[in-house]
């Protein structure tokens, strides 16, 4: 099974845009096996690091330290602020590793609950990222690798980076905005499926939203988009908070 693979060779042949779209549509669909939201977060981390890579003769390298720093940051507010579960419930009531790591950290230091991830003291943040990298990379790298048949990246658990193929890198740059929106939508659908209704009421309270006409899916989409897009624009560096406000007012934009 790909999910427990220790390494995966990169398919560096030229892949057409149509083939990549077919692969991404599969990954975003319910036909693609998912037990947690990790695949969505990993895709987001890859997209966030497209301009933070090292060219190599085999493609573009993204180091695990950068990849899982974004991975951890993506989950911080979803887990700590909104208390959203990130995997399907088990009979034993176990939560995902990312939830366990963050909940353990906030139990030891409750002050962390009120901080954005970027505001956490550097030593504490570094330790959190190291734990997330050690625990969460075990299966998600192999799982997503397998979904793409090695046509997106190659990896080695004993190494310290993934290698994007040149075809994949160019495709991701070209369609970054579209892929982000599709990723948010699929992520929101998964969150809606694995979180109970009482969590939704908690979210409405947290967001100070009294919008009975909104569907749960729209609310989860708004959370993801507002959390992840109230930041600097990928291309121009300008703050895009206005854009996220638009998506709350007009959910059809996302």
Residue ranges of predicted features:
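Histidine-centered nuclease catalytic patch
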Residues: 237-254
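Mixed-charge, low-complexity interaction segments
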Residues: 2-229, 239
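C-type cytochrome heme c attachment motif
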Residues: 231-235
């Amino acid at each position: 099974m790909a999910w427990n693979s220790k390494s995966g060779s990169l398919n560096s042949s030229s892949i057409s845009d149509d083939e990549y779209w077919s692969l991404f549509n599969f990954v975003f669909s319910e036909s693609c096996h998912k037990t947690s939201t990790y695949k969505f977060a990993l895709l987001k981390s890859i997209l966030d690091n497209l301009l933070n890579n090292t060219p190599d003769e085999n493609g573009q390298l993204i180091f695990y330290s950068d990849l899982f720093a974004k991975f951890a940051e993506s989950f911080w507010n979803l887990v700590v602020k909104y208390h959203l579960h990130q995997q399907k419930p088990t009979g034993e009531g176990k939560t995902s590793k990312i939830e366990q790591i963050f909940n353990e950290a906030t139990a030891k230091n409750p002050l962390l609950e009120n901080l954005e991830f970027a505001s956490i003291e550097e030593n504490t943040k570094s330790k959190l990222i190291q734990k997330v990298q050690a625990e969460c990379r075990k299966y998600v790298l192999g799982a997503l690798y397998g979904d793409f048949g090695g046509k997106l990246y190659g990896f080695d658990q004993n190494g310290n980076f993934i290698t994007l193929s040149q075809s994949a890198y160019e495709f991701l740059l070209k369609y970054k905005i579209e892929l982000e929106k599709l990723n948010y939508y699929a992520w929101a659908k998964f969150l809606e499926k694995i979180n109970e209704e009482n969590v939704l009421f908690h979210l409405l309270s947290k967001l100070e939203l009294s919008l009975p006409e909104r569907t749960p899916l729209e609310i989860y989409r708004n959370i993801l988009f507002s959390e992840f897009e109230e930041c600097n624009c990928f291309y121009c560096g300008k703050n895009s908070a206005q854009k996220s406000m638009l998506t709350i007012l007009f959910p059809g934009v996302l």
